[in-house]
Amino acid sequence: MGMSATMGDSASIPGVFFADFGPAPPEITPEGYHEVELNKTKWVLPQWYNSLKPLGEGAYGVVCTAEYEPTGDRVAIKKFFRPFQSTIHAKRTYRELKLLRTLQHDNVLEMIDVFTPDPDASSLNNVYFVSVLMGSDLQNIMKIQRLTDEQIQLLIYQVLRGLKYIHSAGIIHRDLKPSNIAVNERCEVKVFLSFSQLSFLILSFFKILDFGLARAQDAEMTGYVATRWYRAPEIMLNWMHYTQTVDVWSVGCILAELVSGRPLFPGDDHIDQLTKIMSVVGTPKEEFWSKIQSEEARNYIKNRSPIIRQDFVTLFPMASPYALELLEMMLILDPDRRISVSSALRHDYLREYSVPNDEPVAMDTVINSIVTIDPAEERATTLSDWRELIWNEIRLFQNSARRLSFVSCTDTEEEPMKI
């Protein structure tokens, strides 16, 4: 009775169709697959994925680790929660799959496999993504040890290198934080794309792309999307438009935490966050006020007593001169004056690791795949339509050379930098 009422209320949303979760799953495990129950969740996987262990759970799926039997490598597998609960859920699953199938970069966490145990598009109800399993994330590493300046340089360089690729594809990350930066013991970095937080910078393309909270550049952009401590102030100040430099601010916050050993702006709420930011970078000048769309935020800043920008040498006594200089350029309140990712990659602080001719950007085919809305997607209105689209994406990836083409981190001749 309660469920009927809920479904009835939900079904009143215009243009959104809810499902009965599709046909019942087959009682017999498909040939070539095996069934595992983990934390009360049923996993049906190809037989080459074994030794499952729980890893985490998010809003849209649950993640475990598994051993890929042919190589012995550990991988991470994400099972989507009810991807066909509604057309909104199905669309999100489709676009995440399409995006991850398209992006490919050393410093961006990639999808290496996707599968379903379901036999055809009409019965599609289960979707699994597979990625390389990195040893840890930056948040956990910072909890247990202080990194050397050399390690910090290498980490920040790789994060910026990944961002250069992401930005070139027309994407703003918006959720960059230590827990979204995967790191292995060789100090190799992969940026995790928190899909629902991405924003898409699509020039001359005015259609809103509904990737969760993601929007086209020329549509109004929503605030409050990133984790607060690493969130650029222009997002909190509710500007109509913001740019890729929101990610540079986040990198600056991460760099500051790496050199000082503590979060730079640990705000308790949005007002406290803004107060902490201005206590370090100072209150903005009057010409900056006109850029703030929110009247409440504008009045809040106007009515504050002027604060002088802190001396970063005093604030970060353990930081090298070049690290301080880069921090000064990243942590600027006005995004129009903030250093870009490309310029940051050329900064003297990262000189030892900088290889300008080995900083790939997205190819036109990648950009076109992200920008272009497939006519079939435009026509998709029912869950059956979305099942067909997702089924085709799964088959496209499974027929690609990239499937399970990952290389073990141990297959290298270079001496590792230990963390």
Curated annotation (Swiss-Prot):
GO terms for molecular function: ATP binding; MAP kinase activity; protein serine kinase activity; protein serine/threonine kinase activity. Dually phosphorylated on Thr-222 and Tyr-224, which activates the enzyme. The modification Phosphothreonine is found at T222. The modification Phosphotyrosine is found at Y224. It comes from the Eukaryota. ATP binds at L55, G56, E57, G58, A59, Y60, G61, V62, V63, K78. Residues 49-350 form the Protein kinase domain. GO terms for cellular component: cytoplasm; nucleus. Its EC number is 2.7.11.24. Gene3D superfamilies: Phosphorylase Kinase, domain 1 (3.30.200.20), Transferase(Phosphotransferase) domain 1 (1.10.510.10). Its main location: cytoplasm. Keywords: ATP-binding, Cytoplasm, Kinase, Nucleotide-binding, Phosphoprotein, Serine/threonine-protein kinase, Transferase. Its cofactor is Mg(2+). It is found in: Cytoplasm. Belongs to the protein kinase superfamily. CMGC Ser/Thr protein kinase family. MAP kinase subfamily. This is Mitogen-activated protein kinase pmk-2. It comes from Caenorhabditis elegans. The lineage of its organism: Eukaryota, Metazoa, Ecdysozoa, Nematoda, Chromadorea.
